[in-house]
Design a protein with these regions (language model features):
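N-terminal beta1-alpha1 cap of cysteine-dependent amidohydrolase-like domains
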Residues: 1-30, 34, 168-170
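Residue-level detector of flexible, active-site-proximal loop/helix-junction positions
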Residues: 12-14, 71, 129
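Structural motif
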Residues: 20-23, 56, 88, 115
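Residue-level preference for short coil/turn positions at secondary-structure junctions
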Residues: 26-27, 60, 118
């Protein structure tokens, strides 16, 4: 594609405060956040200049792609791997909670996550689906992603379509 790829080593909070890393986030065309443990990513990025740079990138029309635990961390709250309690997410999807490796036939975890959080809707992302985050809470489903507008609502499939960070009407 004629693009240079660069790895930014943001593993700890001090990495997220490093000016050079924040400049690189601001200057690149797109950012990819890999999997891992959501708690660790949140711990490294919460309240940091790097998180501000990611949010600014989205607001300016840049692209942020997150998979697995990184996608979960983008929501308003996350289920911690340490005891299952709810912890604040990064808020890049400020009205949503995200469940990855989602199976619509087994949606109990997403419903419980949404019920216990300030999120207005839930997004279930199967292994073959993805979300591309955009400005002002917009996102685009790649493959099939599922939206749950409330803990008791029906699951709505979003298939390769743009959407907004608002619950479905109804």
């Amino acid at each position: 594609f004629g693009r240079e790829v660069e790895i930014l080593p943001v593993y700890r909070d001090r990495d997220a405060r490093r000016g050079k890393n924040c400049e690189r986030i601001r200057d690149c065309a797109a950012v990819y956040l890999g999997g891992g443990v959501a708690d660790h990513l949140i711990e490294a990025l919460a309240g940091s200049p790097a998180l501000e740079a990611l949010a600014a990138k989205l607001e300016a029309g840049g692209v942020v792609v997150a998979i697995a635990a990184a996608a979960q961390a983008c929501g308003v709250e996350v289920r911690s791997v340490f005891g299952g309690r709810l912890i604040p997410g990064l808020g890049l999807l400020p009205r949503a909670v995200v469940e990855t490796n989602f199976d619509p036939g087994h949606d109990r975890r997403l419903r419980q996550l949404l019920e216990g959080s300030p999120g207005k809707f839930g997004l279930g992302i199967p292994a073959e689906g993805a979300l591309l985050l955009g400005p002002e809470g917009t996102f685009e489903a790649v493959g099939t992603v599922f939206r749950l507008s409330g803990p008791e609502a029906d699951i709505e499939p979003l298939v390769d379509e743009p959407a907004a960070d608002t619950p479905a009407p109804g």
